[in-house]
Amino acid sequence: MGIRKYKPTTPGRRGSSVADFVEVTRSTPEKSLVRPLHSKGGRNNAGRVTVRHQGGGHKRAYRVIDFRRHDKDGVPAKVAHIEYDPNRTARIALLHYADGEKRYILAPRNLQQGDRVENGPGADIKPGNNLALRNIPVGTTVHAIELRPGGGAKFARSAGASVQLLAREGAMATLRMPSGEIRMVDARCRATVGEVGNAEQSNINWGKAGRKRWLGVRPTVRGVAMNPVDHPHGGGEGKTSGGRHPVSPWGQKEGRTRSPKKASSKYIVRRRKTNKKR
C-alpha cells in the first residue's frame, strides 16, 4: 500500500492524503458473504446514546469475516481477491477453498492474489496460514489471535497490527501485544502468521472534518465548552478551566479504568506503558 498526497487546490485538500488502493483487486464484494448493516448512531435499544461521537456517514454493507478457521483444517485455499472493507482499517482477502466454499479473512502483509493459504497443524509458517500457537515457532510474528481456544480472533486485527510470540512454557504461550503489554494465553489458541496489511493507513491525513463525517465520526466537544446541564466541567463566567479534576460527562474520575480484581489480570506479565494516572 502507498499513500497519494493531494495538491493544495482547496483548503480541505491542503495536506490531505488518501490510500492508493493498488493492492485491491476487486471493487464489489462477494454477494454470499455480505449482510445488511443498520447504523445505530451510537444508541442502544432504548434510543439513548451509549457511545459518543458516532452517527451519520456513508451506508455500509457488512462483510462476514472468518475469525475461527478451525473447521477448515487440512483444506487448502487460493486467494481469489484482495478487497476493501469499509468496516475496518485492514484489507480483506477472499479465499476459494478446495471444497468449493468461499470465505473472507483479514489480508496479511505481502499476501497476494493467487497465493495458497492453509489451516491446521500441518500448515507452513508463512503469511496467511492459521494454526495453534503451540505449533508456531517462538519469535514468529502473528496476528488475529484468540483469547480462548475456539473463541475466534480477538487480538491484533487492525491495519498494521502484529504480535510477537516470545515464549512457550507448558500449556501457555507468552505474547508481546501491539500496546507493549506482555501477556500469556492458552497455547491451543489459534493465530494467523504475519502482520495485518495496510500498515500505512495510520499515516493518512484526513484533511478536513467532512472526511471523518463520511466515516460516521461526529465532533468531540470539550466539556468546558458545554453548559452545566451537559457536563461537570460546563458553565462559568467566560472561559474557565472546569474548576475540578478531569472527569467524564457522568462524573467518573479520569484515569485508568481496568479493575485490579479482574480475573484475567493474572495472565498479564507486564502492563502496557501509559501516561494515564493510576
Swiss-Prot record:
Q: Where is the segment annotated Disordered?
A: 27-57, 224-278
- Supply the Pfam families for this chain: Ribosomal_L2 (PF00181), Ribosomal_L2_C (PF03947)
Q: Which GO terms describe its cellular component?
A: large ribosomal subunit
Q: Does the keyword Hydrolase apply?
A: no
Q: Which InterPro entries match?
A: NA-bd_OB-fold, Rib_uL2_dom2, Ribosomal_uL2, Ribosomal_uL2_bac/org-type, Ribosomal_uL2_C, Ribosomal_uL2_CS, Ribosomal_uL2_dom3, Ribosomal_uL2_RNA-bd_dom
Keywords for this entry?
Answer: Ribonucleoprotein, Ribosomal protein, RNA-binding, rRNA-binding
Subunit arrangement?
Answer: Part of the 50S ribosomal subunit. Forms a bridge to the 30S subunit in the 70S ribosome.
What is the name listed in the Swiss-Prot or TrEMBL entry for this protein? Large ribosomal subunit protein uL2
Give the organism, scientific name. Streptomyces avermitilis (strain ATCC 31267 / DSM 46492 / JCM 5070 / NBRC 14893 / NCIMB 12804 / NRRL 8165 / MA-4680)
